[in-house]
Curated annotation (Swiss-Prot):
Residue ranges of domain Radical SAM core in the record: 131-368
Reactions catalysed, as given in the entry: L-aspartate(89)-[ribosomal protein uS12]-hydrogen + (sulfur carrier)-SH + AH2 + 2 S-adenosyl-L-methionine = 3-methylsulfanyl-L-aspartate(89)-[ribosomal protein uS12]-hydrogen + (sulfur carrier)-H + 5'-deoxyadenosine + L-methionine + A + S-adenosyl-L-homocysteine + 2 H(+)
Protein name: Ribosomal protein uS12 methylthiotransferase RimO
Coiled coil: none
Domain TRAM, first and last residues per copy: 371-437
Matching InterPro entries: Elp3/MiaA/NifB-like_rSAM (IPR006638), Methylthiotransferase (IPR005839), Methylthiotransferase_CS (IPR020612), Methylthiotransferase_N (IPR013848), Methylthiotransferase_N_sf (IPR038135), NA-bd_OB-fold (IPR012340), Ribosomal_uS12_MeSTrfase_RimO (IPR005840), rSAM (IPR007197)
The record's free-text note on cofactor binding: Binds 2 [4Fe-4S] clusters. One cluster is coordinated with 3 cysteines and an exchangeable S-adenosyl-L-methionine.
Organism: Methylococcus capsulatus (strain ATCC 33009 / NCIMB 11132 / Bath)
Alphabetized SMART domains for the sequence: Elp3
Intracellular or extracellular location(s): Cytoplasm
Family to which this protein belongs: Belongs to the methylthiotransferase family. RimO subfamily.
Length: 437
């Protein structure tokens, strides 16, 4: 008997990818086959992104393609919070659900493509179905956000902060490690707020009490013996408490911490922490405790009302902070964001020019910091083996968004293998290396 077949398109951030993995895991458990082409699918699920206008358009185009190529389409994800927009553009869509609406998605699938039988879990590995390579995985610890940044609509799309029970998070992490995962990337909308909504209550893992708190979770994950990387960390004072764990080697010495700007006035308009001097002081403290710390951040240029002097404050901040990795976005209005009502929009050509200037400054800083690694030997994790050699990452590099290490001729290595590499050359993003003697 032929299994019902589902095509699946996953768009957006790693947190959305985790949602896709959960839906696909349940589909597999219920006997649905996941297929790679529209032609082979009986129905298509599209997990969308609705964070910025470009992502909205990409999602709408993906939905349109699925409708044109297959005809039976269910839409979920962040853009699903705006069903009228989806249905106006694509009225043939069968069902629209919001973000992390797993049960609604499954009910829609059941309605339009019933399963052949009741669920049977032997089709699914204990760690669930993942969409990442086998050697690394994203671990989502919470959903939603309690902040109200004026440029952001995440709380409207995904709600306020809802932390997962710490025992559930740790059990999932253990299963990932047992399945051979070498690196766990901790994600959420606000990782360092973990447990705040639960009053940091005590949970249980492995029969022992464990507080539902960012610091305790980081410490427990650090005991699992794999790379643990922290993403989407908000600059709360208690972040200081995890830096010693990085210095000890229990966590990767890496923080993904979006600062967004450096001008006090712009930060206030963004409804972000507005004390840049405190951020610089924190960076100095962190580096004193953990000199190997890698800092990644993101910034927005061209926010409404941003002046040339305020933009130069941001450039001065970059010069002083000496961050390792930086992402930069030109501000664009997002439907439903409070910032849309702010006066004095920055012209598009000015936004583009400031973006280019910022990235030029940061490329010089990143290149200088990477050049200090030449001649050093470090442990790297192999992501890919190609004809020319191996492509790997350092502890300082997250997959997809950071740099890579190219090891010429190392075609005998295995994906997911840890090796020692000596760095011989660098640019602003990547390193070239040989296997250590």
């Amino acid at each position: 008997m032929k299994l019902p077949r589902i095509g699946f398109i996953s768009l957006g951030c790693p947190k959305a990818l985790v949602d896709s993995e959960r839906i696909i895991t349940q589909l597999r458990a219920e006997g649905y086959a996941i297929v790679p082409t529209y032609q082979d699918a009986d129905l298509v699920v599209v997990n969308t992104c609705g964070f910025i206008d470009a992502a909205v358009e990409e999602s709408l185009e993906a939905i349109g393609e699925a409708v044109a190529e297959n005809g039976k389409v269910i839409v979920t994800g962040c853009l699903g919070e705006r069903p009228e927009e989806i249905q106006a553009r694509h009225p043939a869509v069968l069902k629209v659900t919001g973000a992390h609406a797993y049960e609604e998605v499954m009910n829609a699938v059941h309605e339009h493509l019933p399963p052949l039988h009741d669920p049977f879990m032997d089709l699914v590995p204990p760690q669930g179905v993942r969409l990442t390579p086998r050697h690394y995985a994203y671990l989502k610890i919470s959903e939603g956000c309690n902040h109200r940044c004026s440029f952001c609509i995440i709380p409207a799309l995904r709600g306020d902060l809802v932390s997962r029970p710490i025992g559930e998070v740790m059990t999932e992490a253990e299963r990932l490690v047992a399945a051979g995962v070498k690196e766990i990337l901790v994600v959420s909308q606000d990782t360092s707020a973990y447990g705040a909504d639960l009053g940091y209550r005590t949970g249980f893992w492995g029969g022992r009490p464990l507080r539902t708190r960012f610091q305790e979770l980081a410490r427990a994950l650090g005991d699992l013996g794999v790379w643990i990387r922290l993403h989407y960390v908000y600059p709360y004072p208690h972040v200081d408490e995890v830096i010693p764990l990085m210095a000890e080697g229990r966590l990767l010495p890496y923080l993904d911490i979006p600062f967004q700007h450096a001008s006090a006035r712009v930060l206030k308009a963004m409804k972000r922490p507005a004390a840049t001097e405190n951020i610089l002081a924190a960076i100095r403290r962190w580096r004193e405790v953990c000199p190997e710390l890698t800092l990644r951040s993101t910034f927005i240029v061209g926010f409404p009302g941003e002046t040339e002097d305020e933009f130069r404050e941001l450039l001065d901040f970059l010069e002083e902070a000496r961050l390792d990795r930086v992402g930069c976005f030109e501000y664009s209005p997002v439907k439903g964001a409070a910032a849309n009502a702010l006066p004095d929009p920055v012209p598009a050509e000015v936004k583009a020019e400031r973006h280019a200037r910022l990235m030029e400054v940061q490329e010089r800083i990143s290149a200088a910091r990477l050049r200090t690694r030449i001649g050093r030997t470090e442990t790297v994790l192999v992501d890919e083996v190609v004809e020319e050699g191996a492509v790997a990452r350092r502890r300082a590099d997250a997959p997809e968004i950071d740099g890579q290490v190219f090891i010429d001729g190392a075609t005998h290595l295995e994906v997911g293998e840890f090796v020692e590499a000596t760095f011989e050359d660098a640019d602003a993003h990547d390193l070239w290396a040989r296997l250590a003697d």
